[in-house]
Amino acid sequence: MRALIVLVLLAVLVMAATCYESHESMESHEYLNPFLNRQRANGFIRDDTGLRAVLQERIRERNKAPQERQREICEDFHLCEQYALNHGYPAAYRHYFGRRRNK
């Protein structure tokens, strides 16, 4: 019986020594919060700020579809945007800006 108690005590000591979690593993900030916040999410990606990127952006702005231009115009006008929430952007653009082109 005495040998059994000694073996159980020895097993508990071995288990405590091997299963102990050190503080070094908790020092990392990723341990508590592994996700990046929105401000740091794209911080490690380089922006393409060269002349080619600027030209491509200007080409994209110049070649917008008419529906996209109408939607942007409608988004800038508060009443049109509110109307668009209920009836859609094409109907809102026609309601507020469609008659102006015919004059």
Curated annotation (Swiss-Prot):
The record's function comment reads: Associates with the organic matrix of bone and cartilage. Thought to act as an inhibitor of bone formation.
The secretion signal range is 1-19
**Which named protein is this?**
Matrix Gla protein
Modified after translation how?
Answer: Requires vitamin K-dependent gamma-carboxylation for its function.
A single Gene Ontology CC term: extracellular region
Q: Which GO terms describe its biological process?
A: cartilage development; cell differentiation; ossification
The record's annotation in SUPFAM superfamilies points to: GLA-domain
